[in-house]
């Protein structure tokens, strides 16, 4: 009953908000909301010093009974995702707010270790995780690559803003940018320790997930679901993460004039094109295993995959992946322009956990993403960026207009149109909001459009 009521509330909210603001007003509201997510703010008034200026990933209202009665709220209310901070850097830069972008970069400086290691998420009200407490902490190389790429984006945009050529000499002549380039190299060097070097391995050239993972487990005795923490390297290879990493290594190689990064990026590119593209699916696979592909259908591997293929000069794959992304489209109300894209097209909602699927969907324990209607604004905006790069500006405008239906009164864009415990939340999110800003600003600013994930 809870899920039905929550879903109805969200649908009522969406229907009541659609088309309330002009595009410019919607972007400005999103920007103001993003600024309000930086700590210190009204939620975390006294963040620990090393976490100052990070952004809170979600807008979680303490006064909302759904949060107040959630036992996990005390642990997640101050949570700041590395990926979200990377997006915030890019969004702030696209808004011309270099000060806030640099504040986040400085915070990352305070939290990286001497080997270039970054955690996937950070608390802001206390020091978890740090060298004294890494329990339940995970690290993802894809998120670290996003952080590195965002810093490089800042460097390049800052030089452009000062009418300077984007090259190594101009970076080294600026003390701030020189430090930031060194930070990027530190991050890249750590990521490359995870690149598969065995040429006999089907994953050769690709980068594995990272360190530690969480697994959902159904407790039959307590009739409940909980997360289990598993320590050690994460052996899977995410194609989406490797696409992120390619753009980071490629741009770092260009700016730093470093052949090590150039060779690593080239190897990664060739591995993605050879091992990750699926001709039958007409998109990139979700992952690559030791002997075969993980062929689950993921939206990012169609939309971001299209951006990657276009960047490396394979327009045929770019167009095919872009066209495939339309299969993920959901229209909830054509008359009111309520539509978007779902994150997956195949697999159980709780993949490979049939007992967990049964717990959450007792009437339909085999429910899969194919039949599960949920709009994902962040992913929908990824499709919009792919459309923008391929010259379909009308589609970009339409998606932006549709995403305004998911903008909360506070200005934040909902993470998803319905709750899926442990996976998707209906709370306003940095991810959705930052992507909204990035697409809108890139639509009107050709320099930003070309700078972000540009062509080789």
Per-region residue spans from a language model:
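Alpha-helical support elements that line or immediately flank enzyme active sites
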Residues: 85-101, 108, 302-309, 386-390, ...
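Surface-exposed substrate-engagement region within the catalytic domains
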Residues: 375-380, 384-407
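"A position-specific structural signal for the A-helix of alpha-solenoid helical repeats
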Residues: 87, 91, 150, 248-251, ...
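Bacterial N-terminal signal peptides
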Residues: 6-16
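N-terminal secretory signal peptides that target proteins for export/translocation
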Residues: 1-3
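Extended ligand-binding clefts on enzyme/binding-domain cores
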Residues: 22-71, 79-83, 110, 116-142, ...
């Amino acid at each position: 009953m809870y899920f039905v009521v929550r879903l109805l509330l969200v649908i009522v909210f969406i229907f009541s908000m659609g088309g309330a603001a002009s595009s410019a007003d919607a972007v400005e509201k999103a920007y103001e909301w993003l600024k309000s997510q930086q700590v210190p703010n009204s939620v975390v008034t006294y963040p620990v010093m090393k976490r100052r200026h990070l952004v809170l990933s979600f807008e979680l209202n303490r006064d909302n009974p759904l949060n107040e009665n959630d036992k996990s709220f005390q642990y997640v209310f101050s949570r700041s995702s590395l990926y979200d901070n990377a997006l915030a850097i890019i969004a702030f830069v696209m808004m011309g707010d270099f000060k806030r972008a640099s504040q986040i970069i400085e915070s990352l400086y305070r939290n990286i270790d001497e080997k270039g290691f970054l955690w996937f998420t950070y608390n802001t009200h206390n020091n978890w995780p740090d060298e004294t407490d890494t329990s339940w902490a995970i690290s993802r190389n894809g998120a670290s690559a996003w952080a590195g790429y965002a810093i490089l984006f800042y460097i390049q945009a800052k030089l452009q803003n000062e009418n300077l050529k984007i090259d190594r000499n101009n970076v080294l002549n600026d003390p701030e940018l020189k430090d930031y380039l060194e930070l990027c190299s530190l991050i890249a060097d750590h990521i490359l320790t995870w690149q598969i070097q065995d040429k006999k391995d089907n994953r050769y050239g690709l980068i594995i997930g990272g360190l530690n993972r969480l697994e959902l487990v159904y407790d039959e005795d307590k009739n409940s679901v909980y997360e289990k923490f598993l320590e050690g390297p994460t052996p899977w290879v995410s194609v989406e993460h490797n696409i992120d990493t390619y753009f980071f290594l490629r741009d770092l190689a260009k700016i730093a004039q470093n052949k090590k990064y150039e060779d690593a990026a080239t190897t990664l590119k060739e591995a993605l094109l050879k091992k990750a593209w699926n001709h039958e699916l007409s998109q990139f696979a979700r992952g690559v295993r030791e002997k075969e592909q993980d062929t689950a259908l993921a939206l990012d591997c169609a939309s971001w995959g299209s951006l990657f293929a276009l960047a490396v000069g394979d327009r045929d794959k770019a167009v095919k992946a872009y066209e495939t992304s339309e299969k993920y489209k959901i229209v909830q109300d054509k008359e009111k322009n309520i539509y978007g894209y779902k994150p997956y097209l195949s697999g159980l909602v709780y993949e490979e956990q049939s007992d967990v699927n049964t717990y959450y969907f007792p009437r339909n324990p085999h429910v899969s993403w194919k039949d599960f209607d949920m709009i994902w604004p962040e992913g929908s905006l990824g499709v919009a960026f792919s459309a923008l790069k391929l010259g379909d500006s009308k589609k970009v405008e339409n998606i932006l207009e549709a995403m305004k239906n998911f903008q909360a009164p506070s200005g934040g864009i909902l993470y998803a149109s319905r709750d899926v415990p442990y996976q998707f939340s209906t709370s306003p999110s940095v991810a959705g909001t930052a992507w909204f800003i990035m697409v809108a600003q890139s639509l009107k600013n050709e320099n930003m459009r070309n700078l972000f994930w540009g062509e080789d």
